[in-house]
UniProtKB/Swiss-Prot annotation:
The gene is rplB. This is Large ribosomal subunit protein uL2. Residues 28-53, 222-275 are annotated as: Disordered. Part of the 50S ribosomal subunit. Forms a bridge to the 30S subunit in the 70S ribosome. One of the primary rRNA binding proteins. Required for association of the 30S and 50S subunits to form the 70S ribosome, for tRNA binding and peptide bond formation. It has been suggested to have peptidyltransferase activity; this is somewhat controversial. Makes several contacts with the 16S rRNA in the 70S ribosome.
Amino acid sequence: MPIVKTKPTSAGRRHVVKLYNPDLHKGRPYEPLVETKSKSGGRNNVGRITTRHIGGGHKQHYRVIDFKRTKDGIPAVIERLEYDPNRSAHIALVKYADGERRYIIAPKGMKAGDPVRSGVDAPIKVGSTLPLRNIPVGSVIHCVELKPGKGAQLARSAGASVQLVAREGAYATIRLRSGEMRKVLVDCRATLGEVSNSEHSLKQLGKAGASRWRGKRPTVRGVAMNPVDHPHGGGEGRTSGGRHPVTPWGVPTKGHKTRKNKRTDKMIVRRRSAK
């Protein structure tokens, strides 16, 4: 996918780096699979901010993605690739032999006209979705389920993938990009290949306004606030905050572990931080 640098005709365009993909559909999305999406501004039902730095941005519509891929044994063909404002990966509109259309996460290297299948008898090729028990060990996969039938939860963003490294009994072992190795039930499904749009990390927005278009508001440093607003706030002149970095609520940050789900610790074979 070509990388486009804009001419510095203004300060806002000087640092912009865009990605150009001529294969993406230029029209409107497939309407039956589009739903309205309301803005929350980071507020809950009481009106209080529960997530900071959210607000504004261009109006978006949600594309309903098929993360379960349960239409087994029915041949399908990719009709077109599309941009999705709700995720970094591209999506593909798939048409099945029975006439139904669904959106899926577009695998890397696939284009309009390519066939895709799902089910235990699906061919071992990029875009096929199978249970982990039917995927060869060593394969690169994405859109991996954590619970059978729940739908894909792992490796869904642009360029993401995991590797199937072992299979023993009821569990398969996968290696995540972070280095973590974890066990997943062999009945969980995954799609062969990597996620599309792997060059997404090379994009540069170029100006603050481009973040605002995406609904992201500015992040103010704690040391620039008043004492009433942040534990690092206040002081005469510029200060370092006077303590180890904490969140606005006093919880240690920058390396502090926050994982609380001890129930699934037994599924993690090796931590991402293990040497």
